[in-house]
Amino acid sequence: MTNDFHHITVLLHETIDMLDIKPDGIYVDATLGGAGHSECLLSKLGKEGHLYCFDQDQKAIDNAKIRLQQYVKTGQVSFIKDNFRHLKSRLADEGIYEIDGICYDLGVSSPQLDERERGFSYKKDAPLDMRMNQDAQLTAFDVVNTYDYRDLVRLFFKYGEDKFSKQIARKIESARKEKLIETTAELAEIIKSAKPAKELKKKGHPAKQIFQAIRIEVNDELGAAEESLTQALDLLALNGRIAVITFHSLEDRLTKQLFKEVTTLDVPKGLPFVPENLQPKFSLVNRKPILPNARELSENNRAHSAKLRVIQKIRN
């Protein structure tokens, strides 16, 4: 693996074990990233099995081709440079209309966070960017400097869940009248200045939630996740599974709600029996999310907020 794309995979074995891999199955890693999940999954596939890997970051794909070269040589893995919201159409391009399993590791990958010039981190000064796909148009700079006060407040409340959203939006509006806000450090300082002193003493960086909100907006992360998960449910073969790792409450809420909708019986009360065609087609594999164990938490700080949810198709 190349040294500049180091990534510790979260909930690695739990995720792949929960997919219940069939050696000759067709699988998808919707979020290739550092290729940890892909490598583990491929090790369980036979010669007839195949894995399709999605990522919109060319660096991630280039790295994965090196890390997974033994499977590239045997033709067991394919790479698709695209947003996973195009899951169904891009798999159709490959002649795939049904899959046995798919895994998602949502959010931004560690290498993207660590690469200063990508502008994801409030800890490293860099131009405001935050694009997972470097070919995309909208950047964090655009959001911070062109969104009006109301849109910023809506964004910070909805995606950042920050109770000081109004104060922060006002500070941004005021600061950019003097000069454009160009770097992550500038933005982080403006956010800090908008919060009361007692708030700054609390654990965690004061800019964390706002940076998350801007990142979600720039990449339409929740919209893409909902579209992709809905398509994944349609693509699943009988007994196929979807495994989703989330890192914040917004992603987890979306996943939990979507899974609940397709696993809950929706019939009139008082019905003496439920016909087969009205029974849910899906079932939760784990009622409660799977969390990292103590060892993983001690080795990987990023794992602290991780949750794994898994669903299975039980009827056609």
From Swiss-Prot:
Enzyme Commission number(s) from the entry: 2.1.1.199
Catalyzed reactions per annotation: cytidine(1402) in 16S rRNA + S-adenosyl-L-methionine = N(4)-methylcytidine(1402) in 16S rRNA + S-adenosyl-L-homocysteine + H(+)
InterPro entries in the record: RsmH (IPR002903), SAM-dep_MeTrfase_MraW_recog (IPR023397), SAM-dependent_MTases_sf (IPR029063)
Domain of life the protein comes from: Bacteria
GO terms assigned for molecular function: rRNA (cytosine-N4-)-methyltransferase activity
S-adenosyl-L-methionine among keywords: yes
Residues holding S-adenosyl-L-methionine: A35, G36, H37, D55, F84, D105, Q112
GO cellular component, one term: cytoplasm
Keyword terms, alphabetized: Cytoplasm, Methyltransferase, rRNA processing, S-adenosyl-L-methionine, Transferase
Family: Belongs to the methyltransferase superfamily. RsmH family.
Stated name of the protein: Ribosomal RNA small subunit methyltransferase H
Source organism of the structure: Streptococcus mutans serotype c (strain ATCC 700610 / UA159)
